[in-house]
């Protein structure tokens, strides 16, 4: 087990180093001003339009109060907006603003550079094996 933990630790440090290198190479100041949870919410809203706070908290497996606080922060910063459901006026949908869409593009660019720099050194078989391991991890949750 020690070898596995050592390898995993080395991978974690490699990931952190790649992250730093890419941040130093580009202007990711908008992205860096947000916490991981905020970015995750923006990515989720890109994938699923018209989510409510409850649906978002279910997707992210996070308490609704935590998500509502993050939503308020993102609304205040202009990344998302609330839109009232025409059929049920008590329900509010969450939508990305133009600023939110732009930040998601910045995140996609960063993530692509990051993943390419990390995975490019692995051969195809290793990439497939890692994908299989990650897929199994999802099944365990």
Language model segments and positions:
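Alpha-helical linker/hinge and terminal dimerization helices associated
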Residues: 15-22, 26, 60, 103, ...
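Residues within helix-turn-helix
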Residues: 53-54, 65, 72, 92
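N-terminal helix-turn-helix DNA-binding core of bacterial DNA-binding proteins
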Residues: 24-63
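Charged, amphipathic alpha-helical coiled-coil/dimerization segments
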Residues: 72-128
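N-terminal leader segment of winged-helix/HTH proteins
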Residues: 1-32
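Short, locally clustered residues in the helix-turn-helix/winged-helix DNA-binding domain
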Residues: 43-47, 108, 135
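C-terminal regulatory/oligomerization modules of transcriptional regulators
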Residues: 1-4, 125-141
